[in-house]
């Protein structure tokens, strides 16, 4: 019985050491991810923008327009924004433009980017959709969603998750953030003895 207990303790130590090394090896990436999340959370803005045929019927000029200046740009009252590839695909979807076609135009030569801006201006003026939710981070549009989309704050959600996990004894083992995704993985650093 004592040999089995010693073997189990040895296995537990191996697991603990392996988990600790994994946590230490990923600590820099986890820290960078969490800093990026907080920093981008400070500059993220959501706008509800009216678009479509309703504006035309009521003789209103467009609230958002598109132009080309090295990139396809979205112009709003709050400023001029570059379009992330994700936003271009979502704009295409919302306005009934083939997504692949619009992405190719937006990343092409100057004449193609100008054509992309023209296509977006025409479609945004005639779409049956009346409003969209625009998510910006700094001077870049990252997402164009339905105006009924439930807006969630990733900073608050991930912070609450990490705090609760920490109260349960867990630590962040890995984390990742791109322009459109964020996730964090937690682990209990001590094995659970059964």
PLM regions and their residue ranges:
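Feature for intrinsically disordered/low-complexity regulatory segments and propeptides
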Residues: 2-160, 164
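Intrinsic disorder/low-complexity polar-acidic segments
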Residues: 149-194
């Amino acid at each position: 019985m004592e040999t089995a207990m010693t073997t189990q303790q040895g296995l537990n130590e191996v697991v603990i050491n392996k988990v600790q090394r994994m946590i230490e090896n990923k600590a820099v990436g986890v820290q960078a991810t969490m800093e990026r999340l907080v920093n981008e959370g400070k500059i993220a803005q959501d706008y509800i923008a009216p678009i479509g045929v309703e504006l035309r019927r009521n003789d209103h000029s467009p609230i958002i327009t598109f132009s080309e200046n090295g990139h396809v740009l979205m112009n709003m009252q709050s400023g001029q924004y570059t379009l992330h590839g994700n936003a271009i695909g979502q704009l295409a979807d919302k306005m009934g433009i083939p997504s692949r076609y619009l992405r190719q135009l937006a990343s092409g030569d100057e004449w193609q980017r100008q054509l992309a801006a023209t296509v977006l201006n025409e479609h945004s003026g005639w779409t049956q959709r009346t409003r969209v939710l625009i998510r910006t981070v700094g001077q870049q549009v990252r997402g164009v969603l339905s105006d009924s989309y439930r807006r969630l704050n990733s900073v608050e959600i991930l912070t609450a998750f990490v705090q609760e996990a920490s109260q349960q004894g867990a630590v962040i083992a890995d984390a990742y953030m791109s322009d459109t995704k964020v996730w964090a993985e937690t682990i209990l650093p001590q094995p659970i003895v059964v």
